[in-house]
Amino acid sequence: MAINLFTSESVSEGHPDKIADQISDAVLDEILKQDPKARVACETYVKTGMALVGGEITTSAWVDIENLTRQVICDIGYTHSDMGFDAHSCAVLNAIGKQSPDINQGVDRADPLEQGAGDQGIMFGYATNETEVLMPAPITYAHRLMEQQAKVRKSGKLDWLRPDAKSQLTFAYENNKIVGIDAVVLSTQHAEHVSQKDLVEGVMEEIIKPVLPSEWLSQNTKYFINPTGRFVIGGPMGDCGLTGRKIIVDTYGGAARHGGGAFSGKDPSKVDRSAAYAARYVAKNIVAAGLADRCEIQLSYAIGVADPTSIMVETFGTGKVSNETLVKLIYQNFDLRPYGLIKMLDLIRPIYRETAAYGHFGREHFPWEQTDKAEALRAGAGL
């Protein structure tokens, strides 16, 4: 059989786009703590010496945007001008307005169950049984490399590590089964003084080896560690960052389709976020139930309308029952109206800042990762 290669990438919490995502979701969380009915669409832009927080927010809550922004940047690790960005001295600009009343009248209803979608759009969810968390392996392990980079950096074990980093993994598949890792790319921002030799050795021993399963590595695996040879200038000094610019990193690493809507900074009335979480929940439960090895769900909505305008299921030839049967089971077991899925997944909680780095999916403590519907789906399918 032919070997197929598939690649996914991740970025660290110190990547400029991820700084922006985390600030936007920190604002959302602080508002939801005070006002569960808030409408939030918060966008952030970061560049050398500044963070601009804007968007449309309608709420009774009061949030100290400046202090919160500085705290997030500080928690990530940008605390000194040597890194090109300093939480204590950067300018924080606030350009927040209110949500349009035209949108409000389409979303808000006297009966919460009839709450309309906050916008039209398409959302995808995906699951595969190739990892224990029912996620594609390339994105799962790319995230784990970035989590390990942050852990080692914050522990002080490699004191020359800096917050900005990227990983990329190429997996080899035969017959849709993993046969190994073909290539590992890891670039990390670092202090000026460290040698390339020490950096390569430190990254290999402290970040790569503890994360990647040895059975997938071989003498043919290629390693590219800081392949340019220098990565001192990073973070917002190296590139400006924007909320919502890492939507493939946030989801399935390119292994599934994407509807185009970003997540961070949006309250759960925005189906871009909440319905994408629900679609993951549905797909994961179908795979957990053994009804398919791989499953992709598409949902679509019209602004101001509660019921989804469509539900599509694709199992890539791995389904144990027909796609038509799966669609019926979805309608029977999941309430995919905006208010229904918010209740189903208990989404009006301050849980979003944590989602804004290292992926929204495949992390078992989030409610959309539960497999509590698997048994009912199996029974409904007659298996």
From Swiss-Prot:
GO terms for molecular function: ATP binding; magnesium ion binding; methionine adenosyltransferase activity. It is found in: Cytoplasm. CDD domains: S-AdoMet_synt. InterPro entries: ADOMET_SYNTHASE_CS, S-AdoMet_synt_C, S-AdoMet_synt_central, S-AdoMet_synt_N, S-AdoMet_synthetase, S-AdoMet_synthetase_sfam. One of its GO terms (cellular component) is cytoplasm. It catalyses: L-methionine + ATP + H2O = S-adenosyl-L-methionine + phosphate + diphosphate. Mg(2+) binds at residue 17. ATP binds at residues 15, 164-166, 230-231, 239, 245-246, 262, 266. It is an enzyme of class 2 (transferase). This is S-adenosylmethionine synthase. It comes from Actinobacillus pleuropneumoniae serotype 3 (strain JL03). The gene is metK.
